[in-house]
A protein has these predicted regions:
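Structural signature of the two symmetry-related core transmembrane helices
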Residues: 74-88, 270-285, 364
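Conserved MFS/SLC helix-loop-helix module at the cytosolic interface between two early adjacent transmembrane helices
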Residues: 58-94
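Helix-breaking motifs and short loop linkers at transmembrane-helix boundaries and internal kinks
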Residues: 39, 71, 92-94, 235, ...
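Cytoplasmic helix-loop-helix junction between adjacent transmembrane helices
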Residues: 103-138
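Symmetry-related core transmembrane helices of the 12-TM Major Facilitator Superfamily/SLC fold
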Residues: 162-180, 360-376
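Helix-to-loop junctions at the C-terminal end of transmembrane segments
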Residues: 59-71, 155, 255-267, 351-352
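Short amphipathic helix-loop junctions that connect adjacent transmembrane helices
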Residues: 29-43, 224-240
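Helix-loop junctions at membrane interfaces in 12-TM secondary transporters
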Residues: 91-102, 288-297
Length: 390
């Protein structure tokens, strides 16, 4: 059966989205092991995650200029394999300082990968007039599930973090040459020059970025503190704790796989409002339940609720008049990922002084803010993606 060019491009882009999810899933699921391996306390873990965040913010800030100069295709080709080489450095760490330096390398490369892969996804939507941003973000979640599950497997086998990271990422890189031929040229390459757009960033794009910051902050709290919450506050085993991000990402995959169809059926406002409410409910269950199994269910509900939210922001921003898809992607990525990179370390300082369970009370508040922000997406206009459904 002949495979269409769109399917090949979407599959190649999905591969690059899986990579950061895989890295992040393994890193977060093995956080208890990395903590014991380096002897770091909660305050030091918070500082280490801050190093991760600052490095990511530097690359996110530079990504718009770098991508404009060298194209998202070139940047992604270079930084995707570098990210896979950076994570095993964390497995070699034997002190908090070494772990912090490894996190700088991971955060710096991940920032470039995040912006360039989102730009590629928007380029595919624009080239074929078919939706794929939600599908791409589902691929990231699939990577997170795989990373979490392999992390739990290696933890159950009492394998080192270095062996865990190296074996899984070596297998991932075997498919790298197959994805390269199907990457997309940026719009400036297709038109032979720079696109004429306003130098000002539209307010709606900034709104999408701000709300993405809130959503990613909530996601980041699950990824970097969820396993530790179960391990330290709920008396769960390391194996059970490692399943937190996997449970979260599994339901997020389901939600994002049907995200485009849900947008077409209900519109952005009802989808964002319902998703925020479900995330609020899920995190509340996590905080009040004394049972680890019920906490996993709460995180699963939270993943399902947050699933369609960020893809809507990227899609709407990328189709906003007066700005290129690449620049819109960079703006939303920079603002959004600042949440996942900076907010969790701040939770570390709160946890050190107030306790982790108390610090995580902030998360339901963030979900409520997302529900309030959905008010700005009230419109009777059908998403453009609905005109060409999968």
């Amino acid at each position: 059966m002949k495979v269409s060019a769109f399917t090949k491009a979407r599959a190649a882009c999905s591969y690059f989205f899986i990579g950061p999810g895989l890295v992040y899933g393994m890193f977060t699921s093995r956080m208890p092991a990395l903590t014991m391996q380096t002897g770091a306390n909660e305050a030091q873990i918070g500082l280490i995650l801050l190093c991760f965040g600052v490095a990511g913010m530097v690359s996110l800030a530079a990504s718009a200029w770098i991508i404009d100069r060298f194209t998202s295709r070139t940047v992604l080709r270079l930084t995707a394999p570098l990210l896979c080489l950076a994570l095993p450095l964390a497995g070699l760490a034997s002190s908090p300082l070494q772990l912090g330096l490894a996190c700088v390398a991971v955060g710096f490369t991940m920032g470039f990968v995040d912006v360039s892969m989102n730009t590629q996804a928007i380029q595919i939507e624009r080239a074929w007039f078919r939706p794929c941003v939600s599908m791409m973000h589902a691929s990231y979640s699939i990577g997170g599930v795989l990373g979490s599950m392999t992390g739990a497997l290696f933890a159950g086998l009492s394998a080192s973090t270095l062996m865990n990271f190296s074996c899984v990422l070596a297998l991932y890189l075997c498919l790298y040459p197959l994805a390269l031929p199907h990457m997309q040229a940026d719009e400036t390459q297709k038109t032979g020059g720079e696109l004429k757009v306003s130098s000002r960033i539209p307010l709606f794009v900034l709104l999408c970025g701000f709300l993405a910051t809130i959503a990613y902050s909530a996601e980041g709290s699950v990824a970097e503190w969820g396993s530790l919450l179960l391990f330290t506050e709920k008396s769960a085993s390391e194996f059970t704790s490692a399943l937190v991000f996997g449970a979260f990402c599994t339901t997020m995959v389901i939600g994002r796989l049907v995200g485009d169809r849900l947008r077409c059926a209900f519109g952005d406002f009802p989808l964002l409002l319902a998703g925020s409410a479900l995330a609020f409910l899920g995190m509340t269950v996590v905080l009040v339940s004394p049972w680890a199994a019920l906490c996993l269910l709460g995180y699963a509900l939270m993943g399902l609720g947050l699933a369609p939210i960020v893809p809507v922001f990227f899609s709407r921003a990328g189709n906003t008049p007066g700005i290129t898809p690449g620049k819109a992607s960079a703006v939303v990525s920079f603002m959004g990922y600042s949440g996942v990179l900076v907010f969790p370390p701040a939770l570390g300082w709160l946890a050190h002084n107030m306790g982790l369970g108390t610090a995580l009370l902030v998360i339901p508040v963030l979900c409520a803010l997302l529900a309030a922000g959905s008010w700005f997406f009230r419109t009777d206009e059908k998403p453009a993606a609905c005109e060409s459904p999968f």
